[in-house]
Amino acid sequence: VTAKGPGDSHVVAFYDNGVVPVPVIFPVSNKTGSEYPDLKTPTPIDELVAMKLRKLGEVPSEVCSDGEFLRRASLDITGTLPPVAETEAFLRDTSPNKRDAKIEELLERPGYAAWWATKLCDWTMNNNRNVNNNSPEGRQGASNFWYEWMHKKVAQNLPYDEIVEGIVLAKSRLDGESYTEFCERMSSYLANEDGQSFGDQPYLPYFWSRQDFKKPEERALGFAYTFLGVRIQCAQCHKHPFDQWTKDDFDRFKNFFNRVTEYRNGSRFPDEKSIYKQMLVSLNIDTTDKDLKGNKLYRLLKTKAIKGETVPFTEVAPTKPKPALTKEKLAGIMEQINSSDIKQKKKEQLERFLEGRTATVLGGKEMKLEEVEDPREILLAWMLDESNPYFSQAIVNRVWSSYFNVGIVEPPDDLSLANPPSNPELLEYLAQGFRENNFDMKWLHREICKSDTYQRGWQPNETNIHDDRNFGRAVARRMPAEVIYDAVRIATAGDREAMEMCSVVEKRAIADTTVGSYNNDYALEIFGQSTRESNCDCDRSMEPSLLQTVFLQNDKEMLDSISRRGSWLDEL
């Protein structure tokens, strides 16, 4: 191994299932050890970042100005530019704790819940092209409910582990709820009766009923991406030479995902089929009309539900567990499978019969799933266990990346032995602190934003000018698609409209629920809004492009926003 220049990296040694990263540091200056300048480290984050910078001989940039801080924090926390009046008041304020106070204020604004619900929808893959289309709410209605649920949980500051529990263990019915009661409740959401909100219910079943999330292998891939920040695609057919996961690991892990299914037309229990048909009759729907089915039927049901009538809905629930096999019966089945005389069709039938009876969490031991009511409960318990190396690190790394445009592990969705963190002590501090503070999302935002590390200026010095991974300075970054789109609208709006947009987020792009093939917003597309379609954080692009420049200088939408009645220019 030959060093080509100063900096830090890892040398990865691997053999079979063993993967060991070895950190390597070549100081960028002679300012190491006793030669390193005294550095103020007011927070644990600052001290852990400084520990790495001291080894590198890298001196961090100065803390940014008040104006830079306010703009940065407002955009990052709420997805919103600070209004002029707020900026002027903040710059006049001489309080020594005004930055901390501003962070607390921003975390209570509507923009915080709107923007971070959108980011959680990115990571959980809320795409209106892929969500369930086999129910009256339709794809867009389901996508709206998904965002509404996320927004409500973020606004309530529900602990992250409870948000995840509501997704992982999701089912359509509440405990003890009959099919009729379930349909009445869902119909009330479409009718918006008495302020009924889908966000009030404990579960998010749409996560499990996506069109590209039905097969066990699809669910294994998506689950690992969303909640663990782990890529296991390669292990579907082979062991990647730089990763630890084998095909056997993948096959055993996917067995957790066999038993969540979608029930249409009251088909979950035998006696509910008649309830479904009676419901259609009560709605004056001809059940013998063969042309009235599929989307045509669902659109009619949606119209009736909006008018306040109770209509039947599709539901998601785990199937019944398989009965346990005796050792003798299992041995007999295996003997048949391994027999040279068995026909292929019979062999496949027996293999399907055995499938899903055992499963293994990533890096764990084999578990029996026979007679387990819901295998997802085992998955959740494993993720929330303190010894789990992925769950807490995955979310704190993603949130960190949102603030710095680079993760402690980069890419943020690739936690693996061959892709180690740039600062493992920092990642572990945040993950452990997140657990100890009961998975409080606002604790995490607060801890990051109050650090000098987050508040560094962008101006580099000779020691950190080439470093964009050790957090010694703020790295210039483009605003996300939704944020820049809203910023342009606010900047071109008249004073009253601009103030209203800053405080009312429902019509803002940061609260957009139309991600997918039915979203025809050209501006959001060219600025890289997440497509939410490939189990990869790279679905969102932060790269600049020529099309973005052309849009800002010459697009009709842009020119109309400047010249329209009520714009800032019109007011002048």
Residue ranges and their predicted role:
Residues I25, K254, G528:
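Residue-level detector of conserved, well-ordered beta-strand and adjacent loop positions
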Residues R489-Q553, L559, S563:
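Long, His/Glu/Asp-enriched segments that create or flank divalent metal/ion-associated functional microenvironments
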